[in-house]
């Protein structure tokens, strides 16, 4: 195992197309980090640079006490798990898991021992004699993880490994990856566009956007205190409600742009200090914090639709130019055209600068 250090890491093509813009992060020995963001944000490129599959334009990547910028992938002491499994169809599970060690000249007894140990961890022992065509998608992905485990690397790299699985298998494999990390405690970097994977697997999340690390932090901190409008809108399902508008001079109300209502916001942390009054802001509040509740400031939301999500409902309406969602208990299903008393708890309100997109307060 080893720590992983990224210092000022940049990537560009032909000096013109800039893909990554100075990524700085220190990943502790044994830490599980998730790179999450939309397509084209640079997360997979960064993973490939750590693996040695892409060159580093500028900056430094170090694994343990070695700078690895110019090292070949085979010399970096890493193991990768890919989206497409990449198993040899003519080999058995055991042969697939041990093949990387075989071509490195590792003796047979060591290979057999490592394969047996990994198979036990991943509950693959009954499948060792089977070939990939005889396995389910989840079993194939476990074989791919087993192939990585037997290498006993300093760092695991996961490139969207669950993307090809159905919803039920993704849940199962998330749990297996959590258990695997708890058992092995190997430094891990995991790439995904799926925020549920990011929030459930990570010890820290790196939210990527257009080649920048928008925010780095524990999942709960990123969720509860997003650093930018982008993070607020990307992390969370459904996304945070974000409204452009103007904060009154006395800081008591926020008028939503596009003819929306004046919302009660008095008492929100930072108003009159970091959050200047009498100017434009972007106001954010999560749907689950708008569930009607007694003793909390409220505003009327005309309901135009309601989605049944199983355990709860999601009511939709509009304030001015903005679509608004409110999470409701399973028993509350307002009809179209009804008025919903949406809560606006002061301590749950977020303000962002409309120009920079950065959080205030």
UniProtKB/Swiss-Prot annotation:
InterPro entries registered for this protein in UniProt? AAA+_ATPase, ABC_transporter-like_ATP-bd, ABC_transporter-like_CS, ABC_transpr_MalK-like, ABC_transpr_MalK/UgpC-like, Mo/tungstate-bd_C_term_dom, NA-bd_OB-fold, OB_MalK-like
> EC number(s)?
7.6.2.10
What GO annotations for molecular function exist for this entry? Answer: ABC-type glycerol-3-phosphate transporter activity; ATP binding; ATP hydrolysis activity
Q: Keywords for this entry?
A: ATP-binding, Cell inner membrane, Cell membrane, Membrane, Nucleotide-binding, Sugar transport, Translocase, Transport
Q: How does it sit in the membrane?
A: Peripheral membrane protein
What's a single GO BP term from this record?
glycerophosphodiester transmembrane transport
Keyword Cell inner membrane attached: yes
Q: Which residues bind ATP?
A: 37-44
What's any one GO cellular component for it? ATP-binding cassette (ABC) transporter complex, substrate-binding subunit-containing
Disulphide bridges in this chain? none
Q: Which CDD domains match?
A: ABC_MalK_N
Which SMART domains does UniProt cross-reference here? Answer: AAA
Spell out the Gene3D superfamilies in the cross-references: 2.40.50.100, Nucleic acid-binding proteins (2.40.50.140), P-loop containing nucleotide triphosphate hydrolases (3.40.50.300)
Q: Which reaction does it catalyse?
A: sn-glycerol 3-phosphate(out) + ATP + H2O = sn-glycerol 3-phosphate(in) + ADP + phosphate + H(+)
Q: Which residues form the ABC transporter domain?
A: 4-235
Determine the domain of life of the protein's source.
Bacteria
Localization per record:
Cell inner membrane
The task this protein performs is described as:
Part of the ABC transporter complex UgpBAEC involved in sn-glycerol-3-phosphate (G3P) import. Responsible for energy coupling to the transport system.
This protein's assembly is summarised as: The complex is composed of two ATP-binding proteins (UgpC), two transmembrane proteins (UgpA and UgpE) and a solute-binding protein (UgpB).
Q: Which NCBIfam families does the entry link to?
A: PRK11650.1
Please give the family membership noted in the entry. Answer: Belongs to the ABC transporter superfamily. sn-glycerol-3-phosphate importer (TC 3.A.1.1.3) family.
**Official protein name in the record:** sn-glycerol-3-phosphate import ATP-binding protein UgpC
Species lineage, top-down?
Answer: Bacteria, Pseudomonadati, Pseudomonadota, Betaproteobacteria, Burkholderiales
Gene for this chain:
ugpC
